[in-house]
Amino acid sequence: MDLKERILAYMHEEAYRPLPAEELADGMQLTPEDLVQFDAALEELEKEGAIIKNRSDLYGIPSRMHLVVGRLSMTAKGFGFIIPDVRDSEEETDVFVPGADLNTAMHGDRVVARVTPAQEEGRSREGEIIRILERANEKIVGTFESSKTFGFVTPDNTKLSQDIFVPKKAFHGAKTGSKVVVEITKWPDRRRNAEGKVIEVLGKVGDPGVDVLSVMRQYDLSETFPEDVQEAADNVEQEPSPEEYRGRRDRRDLPIVTVDGEDSKDLDDGVFARRNPDGSFFLGVYIADVSWYVRENQPLDREARERGTSVYLVDRVIPMLPKELSNGICSLNAGVDRLAMACEMQISPEGEVTSYEIVPTVIHVYRRLTYNIVNKVLVDKAEPYLSDNQDIREMSAT
């Protein structure tokens, strides 16, 4: 157990009461080596919001001091709710914060609030923000307006209710009606709004493509990948080798199909179904085995976790993984072998799953279908779609 963990464990003891740093160190009976690191450990824990130092310089656990640490979620109406990092019970609600008690905190900030219990059952607790631990909006996308001596940016995100003041020297080419990215240089206080400088002009509001660029900048979406991530993707072979088939169930003989949008390039799941002689059904669902290529805590894995998901915009896709994987070896393209994880099920005539297996497989997708083709076959019964897919009509009847 490291020093920070020991400090927290000591503070969570039932008999603990808030103490100054010196008495806390004495009570823990720290060694000389621990004492060298003690102040830094306290500072880190305080920055993390795991402990609180009050106005009397006493250290304690937030929940025992009627405080809550969490992330502020604002509404367009000017009030917000704190989503606690930790809930001591399921009954603990989010904390309602009136606009007058925000104390310059902005949407997404990690904050500490002094809390009063809910006045009525079923209502949220109410709080006043007393400290901002971490600012969330260092860069903001919005519309620029200028005057002779200064400008301001109205954020696109309606949860950011205050305009950002921009000194004339920080316009950097922005004009009234420009969509811009502004970087905060001074955080707001009780008497003034936040101040910033324009770091990128995306174009004029309403111009083609500016709306998409605005979304990309607002959510920090990048079409390119860090060098180590791209290098890892470039080193992945684009065809599986026979050695990789060992230990996998060979399903290359099944006429598995994928069903996706017309323009989809990352085809990550396929399906096959048939009726058994006794009237029951076999159903196989095959998902690209991305984990075979994206190893835990390696560059590809870390980047994928950071991105969280692929993002589909009007005119482009921002992939979670480089295209060498998302559109290549991890895409279940027709006519090539691919590694997949499968859930293979036996289903009764009444539609109940009677058994299933989750197994690694190697597959060979028979055909790429689209939602339009499936609709033409199953609903419209239209030619030439019926004839073109006669060989898999039995599956659709299943």
Regions from the PLM with identified roles:
Residues 1-287, 291-336, 375, 396:
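Charge-lined substrate channels and their catalytic hotspots, especially those that engage the 3′ end
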